[in-house]
C-alpha cells in the first residue's frame, strides 16, 4: 500500500492539469436528459417515478388535494427529520458569518465585463429554449422538491435509491435528514446584496416559463421571485449532494454530478443564469468544507452518517458497497460522460479572460471534501489532486483573491477520477 501511495504522489507532482474535455452546449443538454425518466432503463424509470410519487405525497400532506398554496409551507416532517436531536445538540451553524463569507467570495460578480453579462443571458436563453420535455419535467420536480431529499435518490442507483426512499419516509435516516437540510446556508443575503434581476425579467427577453404538468399539475408557469444571483436552489442541491456523498462515498462521483444537474435545472426553467449556478456551487463547496472541518459538526456528522449507513444496509439486505453497485444500463449517473457534464457546468462555456495564470492555492482544510471518498490518501495528496485537476484561471468569478480562484476552479469530479486512475 505504501508503494502505491508513493507512486500516486509522484504521479501527481509530475502531472499537468488533467481536465474532462470541453463539450458543446447541445451535448451537455443531451447528457442532462440522459438522467431523466427518458433513460432507456425500466429500473431507473421506476426509481424516478417512485421519488416523484413520494415527493407529491409529502407536499400534499393531509390535504385533500395538492395545491400550489401548499408549496411554500412544506418541509420535512418530524418522522423524516430528527430535528429534536439536532436542536438538543446546541450546534451553532453561524449562518450570518457564513453568509457574509459567501458574499465576499462572489464579489467578482460586481465587476463583470459586458461581454460576459451578454453571454450569461444568451446561454440561459438557449438552454431554456431548446430543453426537451423530459428535461423540463425533471427541472420542475427538482424545483418543487427543494425542502426534501428525494431528488438525491436517483444518483444512488436503482437498488440503493429505492432503499433510500423507503428509509427516508420511515424516519430511519432522521439524523442525516435533519443535519443536511440545516447545513444549507441561505443565499438570501447575497441575493439582496447583488440585486440582479432574473432572466425572465430582463427587457426584451425570450424566456419560456415552463408550465407545471408534473408536481402540482395545474399547468401554471413555474416562476420565482427575489434576486437571481446566486441561486438558492443550486446552493441546496450542491450542499445536500456533497454531504450525502461524504456519507455514502460509494456513490461520490454520481452525487457530485447530481449537484451539478440540480443547478442545470434552474437554467432549464429560465429562472437563473449560468453564473447564478456557478456562484452557488462555489459557496456550497466552501460551506460544506467549513462545516466538515469543525470538530463539533463532525461529531454530529459522524453520528448521522453511521445511522444512515446502518439503516440503508438493513433496507438493502446486504452491505452498502454491494447495494451501491448496478449495471451501466440502469445507472446513467455512473456513465463516465457525466463527468464531462459536470465539467461543462463549471463554466457553461462562458468567456475565459486572458491574463496571468496564478498558481492555485488550496485553502486550509478544503481537501476535506475528498476525505471520505479517498480515505487512503493523505491530506497532502488530496490537495495535490485538487491542484492538478483544477480549471485554468480567468473564468468570470475567479476574482482576485486566492480563495476566489480556488473555489471557481475546483473540479471535484476530475479529482476523484484521477485518484481512481492513479491508484
Where are these regions (language model features)?
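Residues in and immediately flanking transmembrane alpha helices
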Residues: 15-16, 246, 289
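Charged, amphipathic alpha-helical linkers/stalks
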Residues: 290-363
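Alpha-helical transmembrane segments that form the membrane-embedded catalytic/substrate-binding core
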Residues: 233-237, 267-297, 304
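Short, mixed-charge aromatic SLiMs
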Residues: 210, 261-271, 305-317
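Gram-negative bacterial Sec-dependent N-terminal signal peptides
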Residues: 1-19
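Hydrophobic alpha-helical bundle signature of multipass membrane enzymes
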Residues: 21-268, 331-423
Amino acid at each position: 500500500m505504501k508503494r502505491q501511495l508513493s507512486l500516486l504522489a509522484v504521479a501527481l507532482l509530475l502531472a499537468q492539469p488533467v481536465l474532462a474535455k470541453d463539450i458543446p452546449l447541445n451535448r451537455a443538454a443531451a447528457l442532462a436528459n440522459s438522467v431523466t425518466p427518458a433513460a432507456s432503463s425500466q429500473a431507473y424509470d421506476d426509481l424516478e417515478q417512485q421519488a416523484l410519487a413520494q415527493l407529491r405525497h409529502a407536499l400534499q400532506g393531509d390535504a385533500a388535494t395538492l395545491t400550489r398554496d401548499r408549496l411554500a409551507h412544506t418541509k420535512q416532517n418530524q418522522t423524516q427529520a430528527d430535528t429534536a436531536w439536532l436542536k438538543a445538540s446546541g450546534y451553532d451553524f453561524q449562518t450570518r458569518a457564513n453568509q457574509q463569507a459567501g458574499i465576499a467570495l462572489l464579489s467578482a460578480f460586481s465587476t463583470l465585463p459586458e461581454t460576459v453579462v451578454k453571454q450569461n443571458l444568451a446561454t440561459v436563453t438557449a438552454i431554456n429554449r431548446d430543453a426537451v420535455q423530459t428535461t423540463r419535467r425533471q427541472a420542475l420536480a427538482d424545483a418543487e422538491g427543494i425542502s426534501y431529499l428525494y431528488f438525491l435518490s436517483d444518483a444512488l442507483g436503482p437498488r440503493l435509491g429505492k432503499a433510500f426512499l423507503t428509509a427516508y419516509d420511515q424516519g430511519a435516516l432522521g439524523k442525516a435528514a435533519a443535519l443536511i437540510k440545516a447545513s444549507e446556508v441561505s443565499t438570501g443575503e447575497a441575493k439582496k446584496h447583488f440585486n440582479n434581476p432574473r432572466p425572465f425579467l430582463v427587457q426584451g427577453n425570450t424566456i419560456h416559463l415552463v408550465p407545471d404538468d408534473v408536481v402540482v399539475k395545474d399547468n401554471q408557469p413555474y416562476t420565482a421571485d427575489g434576486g437571481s444571483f446566486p441561486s438558492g436552489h443550486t446552493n441546496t442541491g450542491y450542499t445536500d449532494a456533497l454531504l450525502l456523498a461524504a456519507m455514502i462515498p460509494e456513490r461520490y462521483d454520481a452525487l457530485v454530478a447530481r449537484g451539478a444537474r440540480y443547478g442545470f435545472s434552474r437554467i432549464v426553467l429560465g429562472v437563473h443564469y449560468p453564473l447564478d449556478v456557478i456562484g452557488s456551487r462555489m459557496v456550497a463547496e466552501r460551506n460544506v468544507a467549513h462545516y466538515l472541518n469543525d470538530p463539533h459538526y463532525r461529531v454530529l456528522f459522524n453520528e448521522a452518517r453511521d445511522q444512515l449507513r446502518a439503516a440503508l444496509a438493513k433496507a438493502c439486505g446486504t452491505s452498502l458497497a454491494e447495494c451501491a453497485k448496478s449495471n451501466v444500463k440502469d445507472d446513467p449517473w455512473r456513465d463516465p460522460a457525466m463527468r464531462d457534464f459536470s465539467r461543462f457546468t463549471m463554466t457553461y462555456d462562458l468567456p475565459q479572460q486572458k491574463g496571468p495564470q496564478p498558481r492555485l492555492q488550496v485553502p486550509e482544510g478544503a481537501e476535506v471534501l475528498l476525505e471520505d471518498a479517498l480515505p487512503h490518501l493523505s491530506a497532502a495528496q488530496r490537495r495535490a489532486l485538487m491542484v492538478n485537476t483544477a480549471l485554468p484561471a480567468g473564468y468570470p468569478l475567479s476574482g482576485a483573491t486566492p480563495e476566489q480562484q480556488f473555489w471557481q476552479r475546483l473540479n471535484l469530479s476530475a479529482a476523484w477520477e484521477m485518484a481512481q486512475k492513479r491508484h
